[in-house]
Amino acid sequence: MKFDNHTYIQNYTSSDDETIVLINPLILNLFNKTNYDISQSNKQKDSIYHLDINIKTNSKLDKKSKKIDRNQDEVDELAKSKTKSKKKVQVEFETDDEYLNVFNKPKHFDIVEKNIRKTEILNEIKTINSATGKKNKKLLSRKKEEIVEDNQIPKELRINSSLTVQEFAELTCISDIEIIRTLFLKGQAVTVNQILDINTIIELGKDFHINIQIEEKNGLNEVNIEKNNFIKFSENTIRRAPIVTILGHVDHGKTTLLDKIRQTQIAQKEAGGITQKIAAYKVNVQYKNENRNIVFLDTPGHEAFSNMRSRGINVTDIVILLVAADDGVKPQTIEAINAIKAAKLPIIVAINKIDKDQANIEKVQQELSKYELIPESWGGQTPMIPISASQGTNIDSLLELILLMADIENYQAIEEDLASGTILESHIDRTRGPIASILVQNGTLKLGDIIVTGTSLGKIRGMLDSEGNKINTLTPSSPGIIWGLNKSLNSGDKFQTFSNEKDAKTYFSKESENNKKITYNYISENPSNQILEESSKKILNFILKTDTQGSIEAIVNAISRIKTKQLQIKILYSNLGEVTETDVEFASTTNAFVLAFNTRLAPGAKKTARQLNIDIREYNVVYDLVEDIESLIAQHSEPEYKKLKIGAATVKAVFPLGKNFVAGIIINEGKIVRSAHIQVQRKSGLVFEGDITTIKIVKKDVEEVSEGNECGLFIEEFSEWKVGDSIEIFELIQI
């Protein structure tokens, strides 16, 4: 089909049927405002039918089309090269049925089949883009809209890494503009090429009612597994220090034990006396007349920090399970036992606080035996050492046992290799920017190396060891802190380093492809009931700013455990760093509370908060934050009551009182009190339920009337009394 010397329609033949395909999106606006005539010519019995489509346009559209044409010389050339006829295009049909099927299709732009394959539209986009450059963004956007319309938004999306805005848009069939707008309303300005972290993707999924499922990454993990297998059989290896993770219930003495080993006082300095971040330390020990090193990972015991404990287990060689002799096996103890068994790690049980009066070592051993941890003294295979972390009792024996076990396992590494390991924790520093706590598991990390994780690439510009000293290298089984990165790294990610940017980028490109293996699962159930249920609840909005990514995980985990029937708790966004004026302004727009955990307020943020009357709540202990949110929920929730029946009455007469009516009642059983809650019943059922306004005997207000007596009952919200109405009287007891 031709219009103003441009080809807009070409023949397209598929195995299913014959359709007419538009090859220039300019026709989208023109086609609905045109009139066309269809005529049929029948030449002979075996002749082929011809379908003639003649386009007539109005003058206004003609002028608009000419104006567009003047700016599209390249499009004209492209269009002319595809033109076969000046005035019309002939579509051939081999049978009568094929011809008649054309007339069953809608007589407007829907003549273009909606089942055009996505790849064909994308090819047209490429053609338009190469021919027109930046002049026809509208044409490209229309084509992209066609793809979105023809695809279903998935109900579930499985991912194993971060994604860019554009990648998320393509995978979910949601416009990238809509995604950018949604994030902007949450206070996060992004571009189409910006990488979205896992938490942000999960929040977007909630906004668009997509269930985001996180799958385990394979790329770097597989590389490290292969490398570990190679190390075991390599001749060019050295003995490395064992990595030991201390696990146990909160307040069972994990950090106190580490303090005694390191001769430090970390436990006394921790907020609330509990560990709230994963920490790694290298300790020097005298063993068999030589200096040996042990790397200790101290993990939080609070239930909210389960992700941190998992990270500790994933990188450890040996686990010390700490159980308090005066407290026994607790929920986080059981969680740790199950995780250790799943990982098939060597375990040493340290029974702590044996100096306490309530200490009962045998009881602890009996409790542990229920979980198949049988002490060696009972004929089992689990070494158990009674210790006192505060007094230092049997600490040397514990260290000797760790090194003995390490010698048996024979942990090895290749020092000359480029470094690989795990990101333990990350946070934002005001002066240094993104900072990561890492553990080198193989090779040597050097200042200036390029570090690659599954989702990021950056150059190391500074390093500290576990004691806070500036260093230039980190050897195998060494914890440290690095900075100079362009973005915050994901806690728990594996990393690999390179000495030059070219190799790093090549490796990063391959890893990015490996990490984008994503599957869909379209859920057939209609989620509308859940949406309606949530929409009927009041919403408490929060903005969360923390010191580390681990803190975000722990707080979100803790908040998700809070049960509430009347309110919906919504974390609008969570980020690392200080509370800024932008956070405060966004909180004002969304009526949100700002939660600042172990972080400060930027200059001007406090002043802006006062001006906008925004509540910024600061915490340094996760217990306090959770308790405060529970208190907020109670304040914003309607109290719940249970009904206790205390009496019954019957309406004997109805009297006018101004514009309302008063019921004259007799108490048949129990009593009626001024503070009571009543239900009025008739043959038709319940006609009123509510509270009493006043009770009168003659003209005197009274608080209570007992069984067998009469009184007047006035209720401000109800006056449709009828003689014979039954009244049930309740006392409301708050639950």
Curated annotation (Swiss-Prot):
Residue span of region G5: 388-390
Region of interest: G1: 248-255
Key words of the record: Chloroplast, GTP-binding, Initiation factor, Nucleotide-binding, Plastid, Protein biosynthesis
A cellular component term, taken from the record's GO annotations: cytosol
Principal location listed in the UniProt entry: plastid
Cystine connections: none
UniProt binding sites for GTP: 248-255, 298-302, 352-355
Positions of region (G2): 273-277
Region (G3): 298-301
The name this protein goes by in its record: Translation initiation factor IF-2, chloroplastic
Any one GO MF annotation of this record: GTP binding
Function: One of the essential components for the initiation of protein synthesis. Protects formylmethionyl-tRNA from spontaneous hydrolysis and promotes its binding to the 30S ribosomal subunits. Also involved in the hydrolysis of GTP during the formation of the 70S ribosomal complex.
Domain of life, per lineage: Eukaryota
InterPro entries found in the cross-reference section: EF-G-like_DII (IPR053905), IF2_II (IPR044145), IF2_N (IPR006847), P-loop_NTPase (IPR027417), Small_GTP-bd (IPR005225), T_Tr_GTP-bd_dom (IPR000795), TF_IF2_bacterial-like (IPR000178), TIF_IF2 (IPR015760)
Family in the record: Belongs to the TRAFAC class translation factor GTPase superfamily. Classic translation factor GTPase family. IF-2 subfamily.
Pfam family of the protein (one): EF-G_D2
Region annotated G4, chain positions: 352-355
Cell compartment(s), UniProt: Plastid, Chloroplast
Species name: Guillardia theta
Occurrences of domain tr-type G (ranges): 239-411
Residues spanning the signal sequence: none
